Structures are given as C-alpha cells and as structure tokens.
Amino acid sequence: MAEKLKIIPLGGLNEIGKNMTAYEYGGEIIVVDCGMAFPGDDMYGIDCVIPDVSYLIKNKSRIRGLFITHGHEDHIGAIPYVLKQINMPIYCTRFTAGLIKLKLEEHQLVKSTKLITVEAGKSVRAGKFTVEFIHVNHSIADSVAFAIHTKMGTIVHTGDFKIDSTPIDGEVIDLARLGELGKEGVLCLCADSTNVERPGFTPSEKVVGATFMRQFQNCDERIIVTTFASNVHRVQQVLDAAAQCGRKVAVTGRSMENMMKVSTELGYMKVPKNTLVDINKLKGLPKNKQVIVTTGSQGEEMSALYRMAFSTHKQVEIGAGDKVILSASAVPGNEVTVGRVINELFRKGATVVYDRADMLHVSGHACQEELKIIHALTKPRFFVPLHGEQRMLQIHCQLAQQMGMDRNHIAIADNGGVIEITGKSMKLSANSVPAGEVYVDGSGVGDVGAVVMRDRKRLAEDGMVVVVLPIATQDGALLSPPEIITRGFMYVKESGDLMKELQNVAMNAADSVTGSRKRGRDDGELRGAVKSAVSSYLFKNTKRSPMVIPVVTRL
C-alpha cells in the first residue's frame, strides 16, 4: 500500500478565523495554528468559537507538536482551551511566544505548557517531521511560514502573509528561501486565500506612516488613533509621527496596553524618548500636544473607543475639534457596530477620518499578484487553498490553474475533510473527521450546543412567558388562577386583558387533563397541556412565539 501524507483542516475553510490544520504522516501528527473566531450576531452570549478537536483528542498520543505561524487571535485564540484537553509542546517565534504566554498566564497553564521559541531560518525536528521557519510579512511582528519536510516531500504552509518591500522593521519576506524550496521540489503548497479577490499588490505598511504624518501636521487639536492592538508596526508609526510633531502619546484599552508591554519588553517596538505618558497626565497638556492610541477599531462594546463615544470612559471625554483616526478596516460582520461608534463620535463634534482612500489602513494579506509570485517560486506539485470563505477558495483555485496547475492537483476541502497525498496523486478521502464549532461561554467550553443556541435565539426574538400553576397536593385542584410572568415579551401592566385571557386558557388546559380534579394528576402531562394551549393562543393573537415555561407548584 502506497505511503500517504494527510492534510486535515480543522478550521479556517469556508469561514474567516478559527484557523487550524493537522498534518499526518507515518502515524504521527503535527498541528499548525489553533485559532478562534468571533461569534456571529445570532450567537447570543457566546464569547468566541473554537475548532472541534475531538479527532486530535482521540489521537493525542500521536501528536508531536503545535506550530504557530503568528500571534493573531484567529491563529492562537483557542490555545488555552485546547491545551486543557491535549498537552502538547508549542513551537513559535519569540514575539508570538510572548503573546501566547499572556494567555497561558490568564488560564494558569504556564507551568504545564512547554513553549519553545524558534527563530526564522531555523528548523525543528518533531517526530517524522522537520519544520522549517521562514520569515514572512504580515500585520503582526515575527510572522512565519512553514516548510514541513517529510520523506515523501515538502509542504509549504504560508500562514497569513503579504510581500512588503519596505516593512517597518526592515525584515522582508524570505522569497529567496521559498525559491530555493521550489528548486528542491515542493510537494504541496497550502496558502492564504483571504485577499485573493483583490487584483494587484497589497500596499506597504510604510504608506500608513506617511498618512499619519499628514494627519498630525494638519491638526491643531487632540488626536485619537484606533487600530488593531496586535499591529505593533502600525502603533510604532503613530509613536514616530507623534514624536516628530512634538506630541505626547497615551495608551488606553487593556489589549493595547498588554501589547505595548510585550512588544517593548521584547524589543519589537521602540518608544521615542519622552513620548509615552500616562493617560491621567494628558489633561495637563495642550490639546495640540496630545495623541491617544486606543482599542475599539471594530466597534467592540466596552472597548476604550466605544466607551469614549458613549461617554463612559473614565479618563477621556470626546469633544468638538477632536480628530479620531480609524486606522483599520471593519472585519466582515462588524460594519454596523463600527458605524454606530462613528455616528456617536460625529454627534459629539469630533472629526472622524476613516476612508480607505486616505491610506489609513493597509491589509496584511497577499493580493493576486503576490499569490502568483509564491506559486511561481514554490512550483508545487499539489495545492490546497486555505484561510477563506468558499468563493475565496474557488478563486484561488482558478488563480493556481492560471499559473499552470492541473485542476486534479488542487483540493478544495471543507473543515474536517481529509486530503490524502501519495507521491503521484492527491484525493479527498470519502471519510472525514469531526470539525464543527465549539462555543466558549464564560468558563464553559462546549457545553452550549445547538439546542441551547436555539433557545437563546428564541428568547432574544420573542421573549419568555412563565405560567405558575398552584396545585393542591391533596386533590390536585388549582388553588388560584395561574400567575403569568413575562420577560422580553410585553409589558404586563399595559396588557391586562391579554393576561386575564392567558389565565383562562391555562386554567382550561389544566382542567382538560385526564383526572384534572384528582390527586394523581401527572405534572408532566399538565405542563404539556398548558404549554401547548398558551403557545397556540399567543401565536394566534400576537403572531409571536415566546418560550412558554409552565411551573407546577404543589401546596
């Protein structure tokens, strides 16, 4: 039987976020990335969504390590939850390790976790795999791609990347090494598809710095800049522009403060002398000497910018003349919340700058021409598009074919799909592995399933009606009319007639149950009859379907 190498995406396909891929060869497994996704608008009460790792739990004795491409939440956010089920060593670059360590500390997992830092250009042996770290450019420092070497051949896993010829830290993507790998022979390329719909090249991060300088020089008031906390190169450019314009910078927002701490301690951010001040000291400075760097670029409720916009921030009150710069694009699904914050900022008299045309933000992902370069350099025999929704995966497939690849050598999979590669062929296995969504709600992981989510949706949309039935223990008779309690359905004091009708409907339903006046009346049967009758009545008369909960109390 021919030897097989398996590629098993557990997250990141047909979606944005939750990136996780398992590679299996010779009976051993390595895992690349372990990310989370933000909940959708209909996922009430959910903090985040993580991959289903039941396949990995079942095969944890065969796992040789977790390899992380970079420190964004969609690549590291699920690590604490997964580590509680699978104890495996983590390999990553130094800055990524600093961010992961913050998560491990929060979940008290530092002592039990083996966290190994690896420099770009170095390799790690993990069982039958040798994983080579290759520097790439992205919107976070210390990002890498992996060349995963096996006896069957080499897989290039790009992670998130772009080609930036003028990066802020001076470290360009290692195209030379990718070209060498192409000459040596690449069995399979697994590449980022996020920006495949965009033609051309992604602009350099450096252009944003020039925009900051123009904005700062043309403003005589306070400036507030919001961006992704993880984009230390973006924050570095804010600091540099402020220093050149003679302004002081204060930072607010927990994730921004944490990121500043890690990046400065590890040397990935250099704060100009006498530029950074505590936010409580800003009030003593003229407004034209102030810059605030804050979280909240996605309109997140309770983020620092959100609290400023809605006047609940303890230190900062937005006023007329303030210039607010949104140096980030709205993640798909966040447009409404971002718009709400922008509207409130305008309402307070602030000038809000957020147009993409002003080059206030550039993507961290490769556009079409950059992807073509990677395909041309690596010359893969097989190709698997990763990281994207279905249309992105399909368009990336088309791009690969334009580069000369045979369609039979390209696999578009779903999460849980098993891609099998021999030396000469690639196919999607008829068998898949579990790869659904696991919901994180507070300290609960996976204890909220489809039924609970359906109940939450119903409660959110139509509310709840509780019918309390006081029953005599002796003879099973109703002692008094049922008490009707509603939440999120309608205001009881203004719905007296409806409440009386509900009481009558509930009493009639209770009396209709077999043995209605007998001591042995079955509580379950009683609850069922009342629930059915009340639900039907409410829908008929209000066209709403609240959750109806009958409660039997025996006295």
Language-model features, listed with the residues they occupy:
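His/Asp/Glu-rich metal-coordinating catalytic cores
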Residues: A2-F67, H72-G284, S303-E317, V336-R340
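Conserved hydrophobic residues forming the short capping helix/wall of the S-adenosyl-L-methionine
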Residues: L104, A400, L538
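C-terminal tails and terminal domains of large nucleic-acid-associated
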Residues: R519-L555
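A glycine- and charged-residue-rich anion-binding loop/surface
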Residues: L13, A37-G45, R62-I63, Y354-A357, ...
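Short Gly/Ser/Thr- and Asp/Glu-enriched loop/turn motifs at secondary-structure junctions
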Residues: E119, D414, R544-V548
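Short glycine-rich phosphate-binding loop at a beta-alpha junction
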Residues: P89, V384, I549
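Hard-cation-handling environments
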Residues: E197-S327, V331-R356, L360-E501, V505-G520, ...
